[in-house]
Amino acid sequence: MDTMRSLRFISAEALVSHPQVARQSLDSVAHNLYPLLFKASYLLEQAEVTRAVLGRWPLEEFRLGALLGPGADHPQDLRDRTCRACLEALVRGLADHVLQDRSRRRLRVADLTGIRDVQVQRCPCGRALGRWGRTQLLARTCCELQAEPLAAGRPVEVLADLFVTEGNFEAVVQALRPAGPAPLRVHCPSFRADSLSPSQLLHVLRLAGPGALRKLEVVHNVRLHAGHVQQLLAQVGFPRLASLTLPTKAFDAPPTYASTPDGEDPLLASIARELSKMAQLTELSVAFSTLTGKIPTLLGPLQTPLRVLDLANCALNHTDMAFLADCAHAAHLEVLDLSGHNLVSLYPSTFFRLLSQASRTLRILTLEECGIVDSHVGMLILGLSPCHRLRQLKFLGNPLSARALRRLFTALCELPELRCIEFPVPKDCYPEGAAYPQDELAMSKFNQQKYDEIAEELRAVLLRADREDIQVSTPLFGSFDPDIQETSNELGAFLLQAFKTALENFSRALKQIE
């Protein structure tokens, strides 16, 4: 790596390695070298220098993702280093910048997006600051600055991916809606919400600048029904939205909603009309919503072909599958999740027609708990064989034997771009007659030694085919989710409170009956 760094970057590293000297020398450093000083200080985790560099930033723009990405002076990509020490220093430096004399302020735009949360931090301290923590830090800093007596001046436009829960809701609202002049004006290209009430969600999204929002994730413990979704889309409006994720049961009817005698669903049709107004929408995730027979109504009006579609556990029927196989979206799909449906046994012709239509674009396919058994493997191989762009195949929770998996792996070696396979624990490793789909307890009770032997055999299949580039794994309880990991304590408390409320309501109902 040393031979790939430029002399300019080596010099920057040498300077930031001496924090006191670096801070004292900043005023004499050429403006075009500040980006190198920033990356060098971030790489070496010299938080004092990072703060000082931001405080005196001489350029009109600061774009974190671009600065940490590969460059001619330093090819290493640091965008997966969400180092707590460096990010805290960065935001403190941003505050220092707006607090200094107006004549010294140059910064107009601070783009804090473009970094990735990963499971293992490569920074020296090994301590990450996740998306929720970054949101909290920025919101608190904005609130503190709002209380400062500042000279008038143009505010710095801050772009940030926000993650809002009950725990940081108040601070975020204050940051987005300052009572007076605000030196930092937060804009939000991406927004994730969890553990909020529907009214809180509606309120904070109205403040977050929905007209510029590109990605909206409403997940887990935001209890929405179809009435809330319709209200959200109709009243707030997201003209530039490209990606939308809705939580479990988001398309369930409201408690007082009465369906029409002819079986039509005006509420769903209204939601579909609102979605059709989003001319840039290409990603839609509505997993764990009951959408039996409703996919044509929901997806039919969309004006733009979808590239990402998650319909896991949506209780799809033949009407839905037939629509998917023949709709305009099929030929554009890059990411598709149809987990929780017995596709091969119930809808073989439409499912494989869908795969054929998507074969030129499909990169990631997830078929977890789809009832795929040994007798289906031949058909599955035929269906996947045209998918030459497939990079990831995930099919956990299917009752397949070691023999069937070996056959499937042999065929998958023919897919030139495949890089990742998530395969189920072979049914040979479970007691005979084990039921599928499995709960978490049953799933975890298997013969580990036998699994290790079979997994080694499967890796040998790849090795013989010269496909060491394919990574294989069996993540029984799902892949790493940095957002859930970061907020697990708050989510647990939220669930306990919800359970307590449900028990109190049940007890109250029993007393009324008595």
UniProtKB/Swiss-Prot annotation:
How is this protein named in the record?
Answer: Leucine-rich repeat-containing protein 14B
UniProt keywords (A-Z) are: Leucine-rich repeat, Repeat
Q: Is-annotated flag, keyword Isomerase?
A: no
Cite the repeat ranges for LRR: 104-141, 185-209, 238-277, 278-302, 303-334, 335-350, 359-386, 387-411
Asked whether the keyword Heme is assigned, the reply is no
InterPro entries recorded: LRR_dom_sf, PRAME_domain
Write the gene name: LRRC14B
Q: Which family does it belong to?
A: Belongs to the PRAME family. LRRC14 subfamily.
